[in-house]
Amino acid sequence: MVDQNPKRSGEPPVWLMFGAGGTVSAIFFPVVILIIGLLLPFGLVDAHNLITFAYSWIGKLVILVLTIFPMWCGLHRIHHGMHDLKVHVPAGGFIFYGLATIYTVWVLFAVINL
């Protein structure tokens, strides 16, 4: 028999942010490491061009994506990792996802004011 009143969960939006963070980390961080870690120090990329890009609207969007989504992914992993290790933090979801939300708002204000 199918339950006619299923219990709703707040997890889907969190899983969306978690999945986006993992995908962003896997796809874009190698490129960021290449640019900032190798090309910039060896003078193959001009720092002025990177700064100009960061001040453009698409650059601000890239900064937002590269900072917000991986933080959600990391805090989600920590929250569930602690749960798997039987370390049950009282109101853990509220704490970890609250920290991710505060970080998101902070980054939004910081990047918008660039």
From Swiss-Prot:
Q: Which range is the signal sequence, renumbered to this chain?
A: none
Tagged with keyword Cytoplasm: no
Q: What does this protein do?
A: Anchors the catalytic components of the fumarate reductase complex to the cell membrane, binds quinones.
Please give the Gene3D superfamilies that the UniProt record associates with this protein: Fumarate reductase/succinate dehydrogenase, transmembrane subunit (1.20.1300.10)
Give the family from UniProt.
Belongs to the FrdD family.
- Subunit description: Part of an enzyme complex containing four subunits: a flavoprotein (FrdA), an iron-sulfur protein (FrdB), and two hydrophobic anchor proteins (FrdC and FrdD).
What organism, scientifically named, is this protein from? Haemophilus influenzae (strain PittEE)
Q: Where in the cell is it found?
A: Cell inner membrane
Keyword Cell membrane (UniProt): yes
Which spans are transmembrane here?
24-44, 50-70, 92-112
UniProt keyword annotations, A-Z: Cell inner membrane, Cell membrane, Membrane, Transmembrane, Transmembrane helix
User: What is any one of the record's Gene Ontology cellular component terms?
Assistant: fumarate reductase complex
The lineage's top-level taxon is Bacteria
Q: What is this protein called?
A: Fumarate reductase subunit D
Report how it sits in the membrane.
Multi-pass membrane protein
Could you tell me which CDD domains the record lists for this protein?
QFR_TypeD_subunitD (cd00547)
An example molecular function term from Gene Ontology annotations:
succinate dehydrogenase activity
- One GO term (biological process): fumarate metabolic process
